[in-house]
């Protein structure tokens, strides 16, 4: 993939979705050799649009290597919970694996006032225009520690537009 990436035009890719070889020495397959992550990121950064996303699959210890290889662009991790476990050949020596990590990287940042927000389009939202009220004197929130002019300290109303936001655990049915 490192060779092919050099042929692609700069800043032309919205999403890089890849299940890299983990290269952890756990298999004897020729293809399971760890890719030089410095070179990989050099290629990814050249290809990505400014607000592009990189999603990489992994399991430990490879997940930690991925995150540490580019902490500046690391944004969050999701867990893909699979319907069927894997690793039956080693089931006498370790637990079966029922999940895989998905590590998300971007030049964009997470935050409502970001100059370059990360692309994020939550799916499956349920529209609900519900008026909610902030009550700073409720028993669970005393208002202390929020700063003098913080909206959490005042009795305010706001509208919740959607419900059913996704979590960082993903489940997909085979249907």
Task: List each language-model region with its residue ranges.
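Core catalytic lobe of class I
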Residues: 1-175
């Amino acid at each position: 993939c490192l060779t092919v990436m050099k042929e692609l035009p700069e800043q032309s890719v919205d999403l890089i979705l890849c299940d890299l070889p983990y290269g952890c020495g756990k298999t004897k397959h020729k293809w399971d050799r760890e890719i030089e992550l410095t070179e990989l990121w050099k290629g990814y950064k050249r290809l990505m649009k400014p607000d592009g996303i990189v999603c990489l699959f992994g399991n430990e210890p490879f997940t930690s290597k991925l995150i540490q290889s580019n902490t500046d662009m690391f944004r969050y991790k999701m867990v893909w919970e699979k319907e069927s476990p894997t690793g039956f050949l080693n089931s006498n020596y370790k637990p079966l694996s029922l999940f895989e990590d998905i590590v998300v990287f971007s030049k964009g940042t997470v935050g409502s006032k970001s100059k370059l927000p990360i692309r994020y389009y939550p799916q499956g939202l349920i529209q609900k225009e519900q008026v909610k009220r902030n009550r700073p004197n409720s028993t669970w929130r005393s208002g202390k520690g929020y700063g003098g002019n913080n909206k959490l300290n005042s009795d305010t109303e706001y509208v919740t537009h959607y419900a059913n936001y996704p979590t960082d655990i993903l489940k997909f049915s085979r249907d």
